[in-house]
Amino acid sequence: MTINQLLQKLDTSSPILQATFGLERENLRVTTDGHLAQTAHPSQLGSRNFHPTIQTDFSEQQLELITPIAHSTKEARRLLGAISDVAGRSIDQSECLWPLSMPPQLTEEDIIIARLENEYERHYREGLAKKYGKKLQAISGIHYN
């Protein structure tokens, strides 16, 4: 019996079926020729420190898209799609959001550590770069919360 079959047999009031969900997706901003964008975080999105759903992850080029709490996986996917649309429309016209987890063509020099206002956050990212290298931090993906 699969997990889906087991879940379908549960009473709808079962606590496991009352779960909430959240998704986080990291995307690199790249130019149309597949190189990392060298532009700053899109100003149309406002402050990355306070935007509830679109922030910056490790690098200046790495957007982090964050859904609010959803009450179903379908709702979480819908929210992520809407946030992705906003992000895609907010970046420079010569850029796109790289859809894969492995980065395109890049060198350590191409990766700009996020220009964050919070000194602790900046130092944290600089420490990651020294310990693991910038390329490893550029790997992007989806996180399920």
Model-derived segments and their meaning:
Residues 21, 57-59, 136-140:
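A short, structural micro-pattern
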Residues 28, 66-68, 145:
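Residue-level recognition of well-ordered beta-strand positions that form the cores
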Residues 26, 136-145:
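Histidine-centered divalent-metal-coordination microenvironment in nucleic-acid enzymes
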Residues 25, 78-92, 122, 126, ...:
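A broad, structural surface signal
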Residues 13-16, 51-53, 121-136:
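Catalytic micro-motifs at enzyme active sites that drive phosphoryl/nucleotidyl and oxygen chemistry
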Residues 41-117:
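Active-site acidic/histidine clusters and adjacent loop/turn architecture
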Residues 1-48:
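Long, contiguous juxta-domain segments that are non-catalytic but functionally important
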